Amino acid sequence: FPENISQVHFIKLVLKDEKGKDVSSNFYWRSNDKYEGSKTLTGPTSSGFEDLSKLKAAKVKLSYKTRQADGRYFVDIVMKNTSNGIAFFNQLQFLNSKMSPIRPSFYSDNFFSLIPGEKKTVTIETGEEKLADGAVLVLKGWNIDTQKYKLK
């Protein structure tokens, strides 16, 4: 890594197929601190990440569509980071009217970061019977304002 890299930095790896379509991606955050030990289990694995608290606020635009099929309920969510900085460590939640998780619910992805301009689609699936009391979709993250949507 270059000597002038920031104390905390981010690495995004994307695997594409022969047509250029994303197949898989991984996102990492890394500290400049030197880790001791052969596999860092004996090193200061939490050291050097204090600068995460200095991340500037980011904005994520969210839209969603709901659909039903074969007794299943789906929420297709599209999110885009519209800011110039990273939207770090975001989480989607699918909650009932009492703000408790709807279980079981299956997420195509969760706990993700978005680089500037990045768009991400996530689908949440559950049984239609789980929605008797309504549902709330929540997006929250390290440096974004929490967003809540009451689903119909």
Regions of interest found by a model, annotated:
Residues 77-84:
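Asparagine-centered strand-capping/turn motif at beta-strand->loop junctions
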